[in-house]
Amino acid sequence: TVDPARVAAIFREEGLIPVAKLAAFRDPAGARADRTMAIGYTGQAYLWLDNKASADGKPWLNPYADAAVQYIGDLIDELHTAGFEQVVLENVQFPASTSSKQDYGTTNGVSRADQLRADMAVWEQRFGNGVTLWYSYTLAEVADTSSTLGVPAAQLGVKNLVVRVPSASTMTAEERAALVQAQAEAGVEHVVVRDNAAGYYE
């Protein structure tokens, strides 16, 4: 079993800042542990999966569920207690596939983008300056509107952004600079570009 506190301590001993990563709403273990936090399957008693069960489909936490937002916040708190002052959140989003079979419960007409904004606001208010929260999104989710977010990532009010560049879309230094500038103009305070094909992560 990995001890997060020991991992954080080792990084600090080496003069490095320990940073943890969470999968946020793409958490099948959490979804199965408490079904009230998960996206349901319309008209059925079981959970919605992001693929066929035979193809290893996974359930997701429901961004509209207060319990799911609280649960993710509690995970962040556990990491902070273990010594991680920065946490990268991936999958602060809705599943890429959309279907009438997805049951999000009562949404009160709140859009996907507004719900994600509200979820982020809960975490930011809870942790304030105690934990630096980063939000990690694909280049496509940053550059344009997607079904997963409802708006480009910066319009969610993200202050600390990690942009994941797919290998097929590796960027030149000029393109990366333009991307960072565009996000700054959209209100993002800190941008990290992860372009593995170019060996770039800063």
Question: Residues of each region from the PLM?
Answer:
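Aromatic-lined carbohydrate-binding/catalytic grooves of carbohydrate-active enzymes
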Residues: 1-2
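Aromatic-lined carbohydrate-recognition surfaces of secreted/lumenal glycan-active proteins
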Residues: 19-27, 88-91, 110-149, 164-167, ...
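Active-site-adjacent "subsite" loops/lids of carbohydrate-active enzymes
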Residues: 25-77
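Active-site groove signature of glycoside hydrolases
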Residues: 60-101
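Short, acidic/polar
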Residues: 66-80, 143-155, 175-176
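Substrate-binding cleft of secreted/luminal carbohydrate-active enzymes
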Residues: 153, 157-202
